[in-house]
A protein has these predicted regions:
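Conserved phosphate/anionic-ligand binding catalytic regions in large, soluble enzymes, centered on
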Residues: 19-35, 253-270, 311-315
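Hydrophobic alpha-helical bundle architecture
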Residues: 36-39, 65, 275-288, 298-364, ...
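Glycine/charged-rich beta-loop-alpha catalytic/anionic-binding loops adjacent to active sites
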Residues: 9-19, 55-63, 247-257, 297-307, ...
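Signature of multi-pass transmembrane helix bundles
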Residues: 108-250, 415-426
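Flexible, glycine/charged-enriched surface loops at secondary-structure junctions
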Residues: 43-47, 88-93, 115-116, 191-197, ...
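Acidic-glycine-rich active-site phosphate/pyrophosphate-binding loop
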Residues: 1-10, 43-55, 231-250, 282-300, ...
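Internal helix-turn-beta structural module
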Residues: 338-426
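Early transmembrane hairpin of solute transport permeases
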Residues: 27-126, 130
């Protein structure tokens, strides 16, 4: 493989597979607010948040980590101001103390934070403005959960960056394709990727254990094992769902994310880990399979976009299915069939925000990926011209990406309208 392409793929994994404490949208709000408070240099009198619809959608129903069960944009922002450490970025709330939680509860009840919907902006858009007397500081985040594009203090612009990927961390995701991903997985020097992949295995396995031991959320993972038994096909989706049960329920354990999402990070990894155990795979085989799952998921998301009405569990599960087929020695054709079969089955599940039902959607998506895997190994796959299925895997990925990015735009708006009570459904 060309060295430039090889280095780009390594960099993609390093950039994308990072730890995050709690659901990434409320964490991004906490980070923006904590950073604004740091710039202000004193404790503010109040905070004003302006957020895109997708941010509001993904924060409204999820428990803010380390908040003792509190929910909402105001809670995330206030907790970031009161007890957050902006230098920790996606782990901004890791060092929160009990007194910070109680103060957050009091300030939220007193209306300390206001939030307004910002329309006609990027899907991932957050502005945190903190005020003290006549002084203020404002931090803007666009496109990535920790990508600050502007810092203002008292009308003076202290920092401004292009609304694009950080230049120092730039990677070209347009170079991703299934064929090259498989070549990279087969040939990569494990030492170049072991750090990020081992961290993903360790952290995501720990939160899956937590979700199976304790009754978080709707207990999807626990219910799957109780009702359907202990077969690897059940364990694979149960552990991914259990991790989401815990994360959506406010568990403070960190997760290694994929495409900016903890749920997607767990979905691309935990089913693959479970199948690798059942097949008695070596650590190296597991690492190479995780390269496949992570990059296949990221490949799809570059067409779908970071936040949309398209449930990211589906693209993540496609990655898992591809990696499971890879573990079984599947060819490029078998792996392509797995991806197409998964997209053709559950592509288009809607995202109506981060919440407890995400775990159920993960279970459904992983189930479809496992079915897609078994069909693919038998050389069965949905044919070109059937729905959005194209002549090859790349065309099918692009067509589903178009549906998610363009076709579901109005769906996204109407989901938000329902969630914030802007429409009456008769």
């Amino acid at each position: 493989m060309d060295k430039k392409l090889y280095d780009n793929y390594v960099k993609i994994l390093e950039n994308e597979l990072v730890p995050a404490l709690g659901c990434t949208e409320p964490i991004a709000i906490a980070y923006a607010a904590a950073k604004a408070r740091e710039i202000l240099g004193e404790f503010p009198d109040h905070v004003e948040m302006r957020c895109s619809g997708n941010i509001i959608k993904n924060v409204k129903g999820v428990t803010v980590p380390n908040s003792d069960g509190q929910r909402g944009i105001d809670v995330a922002a206030i907790l970031g101001i009161v007890g957050g450490d902006a230098s920790r970025e996606l782990e901004v709330l890791e060092s929160v103390k009990q007194e910070d939680i109680e103060k957050t509860r009091e300030l939220a009840a007193a209306g300390y934070c206001t939030c307004t919907l910002q329309e006609d902006v990027a899907n991932l858009y957050i502005v945190a403005k903190v005020c003290k007397g006549s002084h203020y500081a404002e931090v803007t985040i666009i496109n990535r959960h920790t990508y600050i594009t502007k810092i203002v203090k008292d009308d003076a612009i202290l920092f401004e960056a292009a609304v694009s990927e950080e230049s120092s961390n730039y990677v070209d995701k347009s170079l991703l394709n299934v064929k090259d991903i498989l070549e990279f997985a087969n040939t990569v020097d494990i030492d170049d990727v072991i750090a990020v992949l081992k961290r993903q295995i360790d952290m995501n396995s720990a939160i899956a254990d937590e979700g199976l031991i304790h009754p978080y959320g709707a207990q999807i993972g626990r219910t799957l094992l109780q009702v359907y038994g202990d077969d690897v096909k059940i364990r694979a989706k149960a552990r991914a769902a259990a991790g989401s049960d815990a994360r959506m329920g406010g568990c403070s354990l960190p997760v290694v994310i994929n495409s900016g999402s903890g749920n997607q990070g767990m979905t691309v990894s935990l089913p693959v880990i479970e199948f690798a155990k059942s097949l008695f795979c070596t650590e190296e085989q597991l690492y190479r399979a995780l390269v496949v799952s992570n990059l296949v998921a990221i490949h799809q998301k570059k067409y779908i976009g970071s936040l949309s009405a398209y449930c990211g569990a589906v693209s993540a599960a496609c990655g898992s299915g591809a990696a499971i087929t890879y573990l079984y020695g599947g060819t490029y054709e078998d792996i392509s069939a797995t991806i197409v079969n998964t997209i053709g089955n559950v592509g288009g599940i809607v995202c109506d925000g981060a919440k407890s039902s995400c775990a159920a959607k993960i279970a459904s998506a992983v189930d479809a990926a496992i079915l897609g895997h078994f069909l693919g190994r038998k050389h069965h796959w949905f044919q070109p011209g059937e729905g959005i299925v194209q002549k090859d895997v790349e065309g099918t990925i692009k067509s589903m990406g178009y549906i998610g990015r363009v076709g579901m735009k109005d769906t996204d708006k109407q989901i938000l309208n329902i969630m914030i009570d802007q429409v009456k459904v008769d």
